[in-house]
């Protein structure tokens, strides 16, 4: 168990883990924004602690972490081939615990090959924390406990599926 990270640190860890897959995975800004959010959600659902220090906002196309958006928007819709986002000062690599890496790898293996548009649809479908928060505006904060509750429910679904198939 460790302290929460900045969204930038989590994004850089996802980039690093993605590159180490066979074949390597590279992500567009939209994918990366959603993967960080999903990893934050699963961490809340499984460990009951946040993965990132920042709050998540409900934007038109789903949940967004504004600081991370500022770092990735320059890539447009292209894949990010850089090894790291940010600069020397804000991209210092963080220590990730075994549990955190396990969750990040699960998220990459489960969602990493899904394109940004589909990930966006998944994260702002009805019944999601985004849909409960978004009100035709920008920047409403999605309450962390709402995200935690949503991913706890998903976790229960996964667990009951495992029970019925084994």
Stretches with model-predicted labels:
Residues 1-166:
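Domain-edge interaction signal
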